[in-house]
């Protein structure tokens, strides 16, 4: 049987967990085997900028950070389950990628 590997990424961890919970519920309802959600390492993007626009004065800096949280879910590629997963309302800040594996 084919498997579907679902990769999820988001800067908002609450929205990410809601989508993974919905996928879990679909797997339980349809009786499909599922492994995950597996938390992948969080990517931290750091940007340091100088506060002063002209370069004069004391050197003070602003530090900004963006965290990208990722999850991985493997699920059997049952037609009913996949159709329901495609219908999930995914928030704008969550990216979802589905790959079929044999």
From Swiss-Prot:
InterPro entries the UniProt entry points to: Ribosomal_uS10, Ribosomal_uS10_CS, Ribosomal_uS10_dom, Ribosomal_uS10_dom_sf, Ribosomal_uS10_euk/arc
Name this protein carries in UniProt: Small ribosomal subunit protein uS10
Family per record: Belongs to the universal ribosomal protein uS10 family.
Gene Ontology terms: cellular component: cytosolic small ribosomal subunit
Protein keywords: Ribonucleoprotein, Ribosomal protein
SMART domains reported in the protein's UniProt record: Ribosomal_S10 (SM01403)
MF annotations from Gene Ontology: structural constituent of ribosome; tRNA binding
Organism: Thermococcus kodakarensis (strain ATCC BAA-918 / JCM 12380 / KOD1)
Keyword Ribosomal protein (UniProt): yes
Described purpose of this protein according to its UniProt entry: Involved in the binding of tRNA to the ribosomes.
BP-aspect Gene Ontology terms: translation
Gene: rps10
Subunit structure: Part of the 30S ribosomal subunit.
Pfam families: Ribosomal_S10
């Amino acid at each position: 049987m084919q498997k579907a590997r679902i990769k999820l990424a988001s800067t908002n961890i609450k929205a990410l967990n809601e989508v993974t919970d919905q996928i879990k519920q679909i797997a339980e309802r349809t009786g499909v085997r599922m492994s995950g959600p597996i938390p992948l390492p969080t990517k931290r993007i750091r940007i340091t900028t100088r506060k002063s626009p002209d370069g004069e004065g004391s050197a003070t800096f602003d530090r900004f950070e963006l965290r990208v949280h990722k999850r991985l879910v493997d699920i059997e590629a049952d037609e009913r389950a996949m159709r329901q997963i495609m219908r999930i309302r995914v928030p704008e800040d969550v990216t979802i990628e589905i790959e079929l594996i044999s």
